[in-house]
């Protein structure tokens, strides 16, 4: 989990400091864009900005995902992705959250009782 690095890189500008050097992170060449990914990250998502919307105190960037790289160690022999093992962090309304708790499976809200027991 890279909570401190995520916060630091989100708050500090790269104009005057090298965020990779400051946070002891390794740049990872991207496949579709010029900006590097982060080698230590379990998932890297490459995006191309489609639209920039000024919203007063903030700016919203709309982007298209053009490539996703996931570390192979988070897949089992059946090629199932194990999110719980990644330590992924998300940010919402000023707080960081650890991802991974399973809340349900696709179609659980309409599944018959017998099918629910199998999952």
Task: Tell where the protein language model's regions lie, with residue ranges.
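Basic, polyanion-binding surface patches
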Residues: 3-119
């Amino acid at each position: 989990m890279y909570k401190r690095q995520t916060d630091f890189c989100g708050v500090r500008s790269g104009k005057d400091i090298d965020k990779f050097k400051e946070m002891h992170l390794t740049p990872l060449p991207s496949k579709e864009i010029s900006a590097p990914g982060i080698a230590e990250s379990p998932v890297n998502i490459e995006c191309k900005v489609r639209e920039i919307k000024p919203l007063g105190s903030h700016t919203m960037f709309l982007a298209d995902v053009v490539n996703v790289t996931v570390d192979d160690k988070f897949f089992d022999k059946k090629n199932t992705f194990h999110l719980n093992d990644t330590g992924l962090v998300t940010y919402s309304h000023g707080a960081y959250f650890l991802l991974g708790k399973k809340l349900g499976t696709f179609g659980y809200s309409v599944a018959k009782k017998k099918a629910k027991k199998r999952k």
